[in-house]
Amino acid sequence: MLSPNLTIVKNLPLKKRICFLLKLVCFVSSVLIFCEFFIYYLVIFQCRWPDVKRDAHTGNEETPASVLKAMFLADTHLLGEIKGHWLDKLRREWQMERSFQTALWLLQPDIVFILGDVFDEGKWDSPQAWADDVRRFQKMFKYPVTTELVVIVGNHDIGFHYEMTTYKVHRFEKVFNFTSGKLITRKGTNFVLVNSVAMEGDGCTLCRTAEAKLVALSHRLNCSLQEPNHPQKRCSDAEKPPASQPILLQHYPLYRKSDAECSGEDAAPPEEKNIPFKEKYDVLSQEASQKLLWWFRPRLILSGHTHSACQVLHTGGIPEISIPSFSWRNRNNPSFIMGSITPTDFSLHKCFLPRESRVFAIYWAAGALLVVLVLAHFQLLTPPFYFAQRLISKHKAA
């Protein structure tokens, strides 16, 4: 004999069942579309390009055409075939693709810099696995002709110093057109790209080559800053870029003892802040850091690697910003930096992406509501719930 509840379910008209099923499909689809598409627009839409102060030399306001809009992100860590579970890949790569494409569409930057560790297993990749990783990267981080993408090498792309080989470095350079010691100048602003892994200081072939290029570039940049009426003899034959202090872009941060002085909601967690950093592993060595500061006297340094945010002042008041990871796999609240930059000034703003915990909370709440709706529809709720439903129905009828 059928129970009363089952009798109610079986007696529901077919048309009513189909209508209810369509409502459920619409509800589930709406939740999916919101959590996987619209939430990115909702969150990133709140980000704005920061304003730049007046030109230090002329006193005039900078025009939009003279300001370079640059996006900086780091540590995407696309999973590989060894450690990457397919579901983890699907979830994290979809999050980064939607975040990146939404940011490009809403913010329309002139140039985007990715500060290393593009891949998680680049240091181990076979040629076939490397080709697959590159293909996925190019799909996720595709960009319009109005935007330029510049990628800097990290330790997961070519390995730490003891794993780095000429083959791995050239493989990365071929795909991303990256060279340590490369100068990129846009709208009069100079960016210096550094291969942090090659700053070991042990005289290896790759390290010597990278340092020689950096020294030569520092000579050109320093010559460009000389007074036109009092040029030094050694600068007479140098090819001079625009006279603007450079911005240093690299994967490893410059030397600091730890993240103890870092603050903010996306800084390292309290239990990790006081862990001492290891030179040439967590940060550059003191010697390499001093070299870069001495060679270039940068006005700003941007780095990644630690997966957490930090802002420090180096000797001479030179600021360094460590950019958190762009991936949910490494943190719950990823972000990127928006920079409005001129040859003489810059202004930075951090743009947070949707929190993974909030997306999960929406799914849990939607799932719970879905269960309640199904039980209520078939009158399978326990008495207290059913009584509340009857009261609501009577109130609507009145």
UniProtKB/Swiss-Prot annotation:
Domain of life the protein comes from: Eukaryota
Pfam family, one: Metallophos
Places the protein is found: Endoplasmic reticulum-Golgi intermediate compartment membrane
Entry's EC annotation: 3.1.-.-
MF annotations from Gene Ontology: GPI-mannose ethanolamine phosphate phosphodiesterase activity; manganese ion binding
A biological process term (GO) from this entry: GPI anchor biosynthetic process
Membrane topology, record value: Multi-pass membrane protein
Chain residues that bind a divalent metal cation 1: 117, 155, 251, 305
Annotated GO CC locations: endoplasmic reticulum exit site; endoplasmic reticulum-Golgi intermediate compartment membrane; Golgi apparatus
Cofactor(s) needed: Mn(2+)
Record carries keyword Isomerase: no
Record carries keyword Phosphoprotein: no
Gene3D superfamilies: 3.60.21.10
Motif (Di-lysine motif): 394-398
Chain positions recorded as a divalent metal cation 2 binding sites: 75, 117, 251, 307
PANTHER family for the chain: METALLO PHOSPHOESTERASE RELATED, METALLOPHOSPHOESTERASE 1
Chain's role: Metallophosphoesterase that catalyzes the removal of a side-chain ethanolamine-phosphate (EtNP) from the second mannose of the GPI-anchor protein intermediate. Participates in the glycan remodeling steps of GPI-anchor maturation to allow an efficient transport of GPI-anchor proteins from the endoplasmic reticulum to the Golgi.
UniProt remark on domains: The di-lysine motif (KxKxx) acts as an endoplasmic reticulum retrieval signal.
Similarity-based family: Belongs to the metallophosphoesterase superfamily. MPPE1 family.
Protein name: Metallophosphoesterase 1
Organism, as annotated: Gallus gallus
Gene field: MPPE1
